Amino acid sequence: MLKGFLRLLGQTLSILMSFVLLIIVLGILAFGIGTGIGSSISTETLEPDLYTFVFGDESSSNNLLKINVEGVILGSPPQGDLYWFSEEGLVYGYDIQDILIEAAKDSSVKGILLNMQTPGGTIFGSRAIFDGIKLYREKTGNPVVAYVQGMSASGGVLAMVGANEIYADHGSLVGSIGVIGDTLTYFNKPTAIDGGILGGGIVTKEGIEQTIVSAGKGKDLGNPFRRPTKEELKLLQDDVNHEYDLFVKHVAENRNMDSKVIREQMGAHVFDNESAKKFGLINGTLNYRDTVKRLAELAQIETDDYQVVQTATKNHGLLSALLGVFQPKSAPPKVSQIKSQFCNKLSRLPLVYYGNPLRLCSH
């Protein structure tokens, strides 16, 4: 019986060693291919290009880089996040900026097409995109064109006004130059939370009390069991007013608009294409293909001698590639995770967002 057990153990170890050796051999082979060994084998699928082809003349050396700004704009992904962009409604401004910085080093990129589909988001995330656009233009002298497909509101406007020109597709909405500050809740004489007996909440005869221990004047601002003071509300309003002043100045300077018109006539409304053009928010109405053609014209590229490309999927390393077949693919963040991440930003941050952000956090 002992001999049988030892024989089985030996066979198991032999299989494990064979598997490890196979991984090592595959790793050496992949490394060799990448450095020229085994050059007769195509490396196309083993070394993904920096960009992937979208449309145009695939043989052209003139790249027009398409960058998607789709969803709520945040700053940077959480630590350990393997995704450049969430597939379910978030975009990270500093990731967009990084792409623009790298594009500025690539002489094959002759221009940038920003594909805008966003209600806005955080100020710093939106500003990161704007700063990336300005850096790219200053470093290269190449054009950047923003293309609005449906909506670019609030933080989207803050970001895209750095482009040379802005075009919106038919039926789009552009605008919402405004800032949303703190949203404070106050429970006035509460006797239940979360719907009471019908909603599975808590009901008491004497109401619900909550005590927050804090130090520093106004540190417990946001406690729903006390009203904010007039002084606290004024401070919050002053902060929002300051950010709004900066926003108006930013748009006015970069789009050559009158700040008085923005404040008194436009407000924080969104506009159809005709009105947006009249105010100077966009240069006109163009569809996707015609916007690309306009970008090629600004880049002084001969007719049709270009290809539209976008950034390739991020490579997570050789070991991941080798073991990927044995591992389940990482699922994209769940909607609940996305909502939680965004809702955490709402506590004290001023937002450049179109609509009521609390609706994203209401379920």
What do the PLM-derived regions correspond to, one by one?
Residues 135-146, 253-260:
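Short beta-strand/loop segments at the ligand-binding rim of alpha/beta enzyme cores
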Residues 286-323:
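Extended hydrophobic/aromatic segments used for targeting, binding, or gating
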